[in-house]
């Protein structure tokens, strides 16, 4: 039987919705035996926003739901959910007992999406469904490596042994009896708590099972482990599939990548605003104000106004003295760690425009480093493990959100005739641009809804995977290296794909209403 692996990248609601579109189209494609291509997906790896889509799909399978019901259910959640808004409001409530926003998010996820379901619910049913392997991925900070919440069937290896994926990682392995108590809401939160937006989730302290007296001995034996967004080390979810391939054959690996693909150059705009104000001049202004209040005391008659002026004078004196003393203490401490002499009084004459530039340029460059340079480098390294490995030749597809955006190059492996068929229309490029403009958030803004980003993202997931499967089939016609009889199942879809691609070119959103597919 043909075995397909799919990884669902991170990217907040942008990713979750794009992946929903991808899965819905795989469900639309009917193979020669009448089964949807989605039923041949046996391995799922997810990151951050992609974990919502993947977990919901897996959980629905375990509950015996049809593909149609699973996908339409997630469609409703993504379009109507206000989890972040509700969590923020309730977290700021003075009566709220949760010590962190991410814990409040877990509570809301549990109430509104996963309804108290646990990994144990999936473990009990994994042998009865079409999914053999599932891995929702987070990052643990102690060893700067992946932390996998895995559920899988016991697989016989090529060497004759038996293997099942590790829950956790090589440094921290979670016993199955503990793992089955972990809530799906906690898995999603751990995989998607991105730095800057949320606090780290500490294992096992922040997990619900830690409160059960039965687990006290285990909880006390584990040193708290900080866990955050899986996209920090692998935003495409590639590594778990590489590891699974060592245990079993994979005929096709679809990397569903919801990165927005922006390539804006790094810039920092300098401004002349506040260029006439420095700390020294601010001190002079403060001194003038203090002198002014002191002078008023000589002319204001005794009574209410005397008290008011006296209070204002005292407040300004306290502020002035506090700033002077704290600055002196800070400079003295800092000077001890600097190996050269420096006239620190010169700093007082630097205007605030320069200070803004000094601080702003460093802050924006750090953000650019982590959010762009670092993430792009990690992405390249992860893709290299697939595209530089001959064992993956003709067994991989990158399904990227930004591929068909305006100005992107595409189809370099196609013949001129194939390029004519595959060329995206203006309507397709416009839709892709709208979809790719969605930020990495866990909510829709009013503007997002007005512009139609939810529908644009679903459509982008659908026509991108249609386009990429068709390109894959065209390439296989010229080179069948490393393929088997199992790949004929995919090649037989060519006619369906060509017909749908022509419809997408006319109306990119003709399948965007999930309930009508």
Model-found features: residue ranges?
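Catalytic domains of lipid- and phosphate-ester/thioester hydrolases
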Residues: 1-517
């Amino acid at each position: 039987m043909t075995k397909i692996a799919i990884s669902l990248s991170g990217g907040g609601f942008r990713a979750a919705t794009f992946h929903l579109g991808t899965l819905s189209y795989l469900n639309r494609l009917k193979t020669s035996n009448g089964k949807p291509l989605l039923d041949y997906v046996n391995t799922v790896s997810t990151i951050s926003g992609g974990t919502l889509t993947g977990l919901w799909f897996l959980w629905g399978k375990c509950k015996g739901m049809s593909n149609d019901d699973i996908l339409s259910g997630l469609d409703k959640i993504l379009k109507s959910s206000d989890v972040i808004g509700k969590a923020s409001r309730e977290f700021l409530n003075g009566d709220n007992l949760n010590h962190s926003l991410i814990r409040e998010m877990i509570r809301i996820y549990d109430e509104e999406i996963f309804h108290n379901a646990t990994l144990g619910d999936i473990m009990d049913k994994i042998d009865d469904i079409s999914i053999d392997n599932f891995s929702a991925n987070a990052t643990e900070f102690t060893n700067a490596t992946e932390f996998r919440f895995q559920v899988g069937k016991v697989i016989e290896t090529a060497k004759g042994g038996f293997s099942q994926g590790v829950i956790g990682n090589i440094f921290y392995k979670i016993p199955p009896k503990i793992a089955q108590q972990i809530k799906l809401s906690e898995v999603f939160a751990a995989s998607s708590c991105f730095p800057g937006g949320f606090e780290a989730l500490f294992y096992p302290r922040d997990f619900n099972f830690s409160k059960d007296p039965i687990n006290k001995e285990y909880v006390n034996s584990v040193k708290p482990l900080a866990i955050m967004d899986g996209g920090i080390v692998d935003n495409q979810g590639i590594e778990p599939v590489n590891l699974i391939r060592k245990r079993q054959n994979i005929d096709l690996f679809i990397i569903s990548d919801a990165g927005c693909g922006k390539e804006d150059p790094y810039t920092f705009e300098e401004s002349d605003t506040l260029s006439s104000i420095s700390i020294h001049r601010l001190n002079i202004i403060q001194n003038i104000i203090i002198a002014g209040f002191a002078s008023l005391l000589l002319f204001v008659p005794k009574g209410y106004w005397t008290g008011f002026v006296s209070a204002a004078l005292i407040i300004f004196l306290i502020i002035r003295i506090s700033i002077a003393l704290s600055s002196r203490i800070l400079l003295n401490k800092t000077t001890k760690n600097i190996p050269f002499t420096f006239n620190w009084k010169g700093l007082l004459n630097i205007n605030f425009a320069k200070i803004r530039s000094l601080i702003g340029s460093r802050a924006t460059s750090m953000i650019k480093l982590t959010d762009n340079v670092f993430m792009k480098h990690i992405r390249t390294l992860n893709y290299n493990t697939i595209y530089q490995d001959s064992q993956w030749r003709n067994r991989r597809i990158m399904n990227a959100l930004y591929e068909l955006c305006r100005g992107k190059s595409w189809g370099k492996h196609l013949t001129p005739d194939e390029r004519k068929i595959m060329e995206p229309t203006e309507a397709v490029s416009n839709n892709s641009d709208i979809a790719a403009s969605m930020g990495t958030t866990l909510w829709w803004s009013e503007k997002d809804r007005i512009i139609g980003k939810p529908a644009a993202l679903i459509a982008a997931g659908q026509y991108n995977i249609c386009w990429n499967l068709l390109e894959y089939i065209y390439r296989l016609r010229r080179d069948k290296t490393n393929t088997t009889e199992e790949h004929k199942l995919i090649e037989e879809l060519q006619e369906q794909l060509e017909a749908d691609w022509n419809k997408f070119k006319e109306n990119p959103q003709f399948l965007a209403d999930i309930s009508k597919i």
